Amino acid sequence: MMQESGTETKSNGSAIQNGSGGSNHLLECGGLREGRSNGETPAVDIGAADLAHAQQQQQQALQVARQLLLQQQQQQQVSGLKSPKRNDKQPALQVPVSVAMMTPQVITPQQMQQILQQQVLSPQQLQVLLQQQQALMLQQQQLQEFYKKQQEQLQLQLLQQQHAGKQPKEQQQVATQQLAFQQQLLQMQQLQQQHLLSLQRQGLLTIQPGQPALPLQPLAQGMIPTELQQLWKEVTSAHTAEETTGNNHSSLDLTTTCVSSSAPSKTSLIMNPHASTNGQLSVHTPKRESLSHEEHPHSHPLYGHGVCKWPGCEAVCEDFQSFLKHLNSEHALDDRSTAQCRVQMQVVQQLELQLAKDKERLQAMMTHLHVKSTEPKAAPQPLNLVSSVTLSKSASEASPQSLPHTPTTPTAPLTPVTQGPSVITTTSMHTVGPIRRRYSDKYNVPISSADIAQNQEFYKNAEVRPPFTYASLIRQAILESPEKQLTLNEIYNWFTRMFAYFRRNAATWKNAVRHNLSLHKCFVRVENVKGAVWTVDEVEFQKRRPQKISGNPSLIKNMQSSHAYCTPLNAALQASMAENSIPLYTTASMGNPTLGNLASAIREELNGAMEHTNSNESDSSPGRSPMQAVHPVHVKEEPLDPEEAEGPLSLVTTANHSPDFDHDRDYEDEPVNEDME
């Protein structure tokens, strides 16, 4: 492409020389005509001999113009045949010099014939027209020289870039972006010059006999070469300033910023084409602040376009330093920030869940259509669940120990211990999020109205599943009512009014509400004049315990033998939480004031489970088989229902399921009859 443009430049240069010869011939014709008409007044009545002489001159001018066009076409064909193959190594970094810009803008034969046939131009006007044509050609030559210099600079920069192979990739990317910017800038200048030339040509062709001669308008109605050089210096200086700061910006978009900053000047020039004085354009180029260092902020996810991107903040920050001050002062580690962080976790999990559902739907569609999958199926990662006793082979086959670990529900990893119970370790803040439901429900930490009040607008507008159990939400709805009692329809209305998730999704959640009302002992149905209303038994609600453990004495002995490990488990929980500084379950979020209280609640629940086990030794079912009785206790991952897949998995200590009703289970989205009340 580089050699093609070079050949094109040579052909255009010869065309310019031919054009100058043609214009000299036109000058001679104009001089002859002016000499002929000097002795007489410029009247309209012309003799027959003069008319024949003018027609002969017109035919000669047309022949010269045709010869010029034929020579141009032949030279372009020869240059196209002789041009070598394109260099594929540098396809995008060449500046295309358009043929319309490099060819001399002479008057076409049709325009010349129209001017001569009209016989409306006086000799003075024809002389002025030819002078303007010469000025245009001179400025075209200057522009051609400038474009040649720019082409040489590009070639030198390309050679330097090829030889400097040891440069880091980021500097090479910035250099290529600068070359692309220069290319776009030159293309923009060429288009601008073409537009102004077309405007001038239209102005030359619409001269009336009574009008004075047109003023001499220079070609450089856009940026003259000196201003273009100044703009290029600004770009290179901005590039050096970016390199000295040492910021790792691999995507420095000079093209968009520079072109957008020069766009207003281009628009103003086209709208005001006559704003030039003495051949120099008096354009006030806007200050290109987008190239300065201040307009390239540090890459921070919470900062963009001078605005803080913290959810619900949108505070205006002048620069990055003021943003950091604002972030440390307004969004420090407090209850409000942790609640907002927890809500953001819910948003992310909801989006991940939606993505997983769409992927499963796509996979099912492709399987149905017998199309091979485009992405490999991820191998399921089994959870490492280690109990205090060695699991038998039959028990390990029956227990759900190889549950797939989906990426949409990040669970807390369990590190195996050789002897003793498994120790739960939290590696990051995000691993604590999935067990938030069991913290609020299993450990007697009730839902706080302050949490819903703080995030009320978010829950009303965003389609995010609230991070609470159905039982907690039903209790909250009843407690918020003036009479502390609600009918079933009023509970439905509270759900849809407070949460957009329940408004916009299918009404399967109503089944879960009816399940929880009917099967939880803490909800009491009262008959009155209105009909059936539901109330909350707070004492029964506070008695909610983890899943009951029952079995034969051998099972109880296993549990008692593992009771000695409760203290190390609590210590490990406290150490891991303190080590990772988990701020997500504070007063505003879960109603628990400190992490110490949370750990103590866990300890109390574990101790309560032990006491409950000792008190229920006689609850073992006599109809159970010995094989069921010898199954040791293991920690299992409790899967949720399909409709509640967005909820996290939780860790519960389970043995053989008790025949008693599980009062703590959150009955959600199970198919029931609609008439069940």
From Swiss-Prot:
Residues 1-18, 270-283, 390-403, 612-623 have a biased composition (Polar residues). The modification Phosphoserine is found at S83, S658. GO terms for molecular function: core promoter sequence-specific DNA binding; DNA-binding transcription factor activity, RNA polymerase II-specific; DNA-binding transcription repressor activity, RNA polymerase II-specific; identical protein binding; nuclear androgen receptor binding; RNA polymerase II cis-regulatory region sequence-specific DNA binding; sequence-specific double-stranded DNA binding; zinc ion binding. Residues 1-43, 270-298, 390-422, 611-677 are annotated as: Disordered. InterPro entries: FH_FOXP1_P2, Fork_head_dom, FOXP, FOXP-CC, TF_fork_head_CS_2, WH-like_DNA-bd_sf, WH_DNA-bd_sf. Residues 382-386 are annotated as: CTBP1-binding. The leucine-zipper is required for dimerization and transcriptional repression. This is Forkhead box protein P1.
